[in-house]
Amino acid sequence: MKTPLTEAVSIADSQGRFLSSTQIQVLFGRFRQAKAGLXAAKAL
């Protein structure tokens, strides 16, 4: 299963580069949203 993280890493790798700081910030934002979603689901 591909996740946004593995997708971004594989694209950067295929282009022979590292992730940009913007891409890393977007990924951390997605992790924060996922964490908040899990916390909300647990509260139900």
Curated annotation (Swiss-Prot):
Contains one covalently linked bilin chromophore. GO terms for cellular component: phycobilisome; plasma membrane-derived thylakoid membrane. Gene3D superfamilies: Phycocyanins. It is a peripheral membrane protein. The keyword ATP-binding does not apply. One of its GO terms (biological process) is photosynthesis. Keywords: Antenna complex, Bile pigment, Chromophore, Electron transport, Membrane, Photosynthesis, Phycobilisome, Thylakoid, Transport. It is found in: Cellular thylakoid membrane. Light-harvesting photosynthetic bile pigment-protein from the phycobiliprotein complex (phycobilisome, PBS). Phycocyanin is the major phycobiliprotein in the PBS rod. Heterodimer of an alpha and a beta subunit. The heterodimer further assembles into trimers and the trimers into hexamers. In cell culture induces a urokinase-type plasminogen activator; may therefore be useful in dissolving blood clots. This is C-phycocyanin alpha subunit. It comes from Limnospira fusiformis.
